[in-house]
Amino acid sequence: MNPLIMSIIMSTIILGTLIVMTSSHWLMIWIGFEMNMLAIIPMLMKHHNPRSTEAATKYFFTQATASMLLMLAVIINLMYSGQWTGMKLFNPTASIIMTLALTMKLGLAPFHFWVPEVAQGIPLSSGLILLTWQKLAPLTVLYMISPAINLYLLLTMSMASIAIGGWGGLNQTQLRKIMAYSSIAHMGWMTAILIYNPTMTLLNLVIYILMTTTMFMLLMINSSTTTLSLSHMWNKMPLITTITLVTLLSLGGLPPLTGFLPKWMIIQELTKNDSIILPTLMAITALLNLFFYMRITYATSLTMFPTTNNMKIKWQFENTKHLNLLTPMIVLSTLTLPLAPMMTILN
């Protein structure tokens, strides 16, 4: 893609998100969502093939439906409040419709079907934007309207997302689909704590973006899109492959890695709010995610057969030059659990 066109598209994506995050006028928020959606579609179709076109079409229809529901909720709220500004929702129907619209944009269950399909059909770089940056705007609006959200509706969708994020990834060999199901599960964890402690949602979002960005950057370096291709990388780039597997385990929430921190804090916060059954179910269901990450780790690193490496040494080290940029990301996404005592400021 032409660098000038790419810079314009990226600027529009960033501008659309910033408009949503900084506006208190519902029409401007809707416009920000539309700018963001229309700008990212060329990014999804960066590679001209039928799969990318299909993925972009699915993304467009889903986001357009969500935008339509969002505008419907805004109009219903306008009828009861008489104003476009302010984040307070005056009608329970408007609150429910807006929650459904925003969760559809996020990819929460039962509106999760588009996430794996779109992620599988697009390049890794576009998948990184889709699963990280594109979550900021809907989560910001959910954060702002959290006092008016129906608690039981959001908790039901959160629990369903965590369960589907675990079950859906069990039989997958495509790494992009695995990352998509991981995204669905993480969104479930974020929205489960949103009403009780919105600040903890932001902590979870930051850690999720760090881990997902690190994972996609590693996959882009070793050009792996399936578990089979990842296992072949072991003899070529052992360091990159090892870090990739550790980052995967961190995404699954295995202690003592960084990914365990938000799960620990969320379960603790839910327990403080006299919720016992929900965090228990969430913890049990999170084991599904950890299982398929462990399976990838086992298949990639623990079942290697003896081979000789015929690759030239120079070729081996060509791809490690990008590690300088990755080093802080890797540290943050795997080794920040000792910072847990500092998180008491969130309570």
UniProtKB/Swiss-Prot annotation:
One of its GO terms (molecular function) is NADH dehydrogenase (ubiquinone) activity. It is a multi-pass membrane protein. It comes from the Eukaryota. The keyword Metal-binding does not apply. It is found in: Mitochondrion inner membrane. The chain crosses the membrane at residues 13-33, 59-79, 96-116, 127-147, 148-168, 178-198, 201-221, 237-257, 274-294, 325-345. One of its GO terms (biological process) is mitochondrial electron transport, NADH to ubiquinone. Keywords: Electron transport, Membrane, Mitochondrion, Mitochondrion inner membrane, NAD, Respiratory chain, Translocase, Transmembrane, Transmembrane helix, Transport, Ubiquinone. InterPro entries: Complex_I_Subunit_2, NADH_DH_su2_C, NADH_UbQ_OxRdtase_chain2, ND/Mrp_TM. GO terms for cellular component: mitochondrial inner membrane. Its EC number is 7.1.1.2. It catalyses: a ubiquinone + NADH + 5 H(+)(in) = a ubiquinol + NAD(+) + 4 H(+)(out). Its main location: mitochondrion. Belongs to the complex I subunit 2 family. Core subunit of the mitochondrial membrane respiratory chain NADH dehydrogenase (Complex I) which catalyzes electron transfer from NADH through the respiratory chain, using ubiquinone as an electron acceptor. Essential for the catalytic activity and assembly of complex I. Core subunit of respiratory chain NADH dehydrogenase (Complex I) which is composed of 45 different subunits. Interacts with TMEM242. This is NADH-ubiquinone oxidoreductase chain 2. It comes from Cheiromeles parvidens (Lesser naked bat).
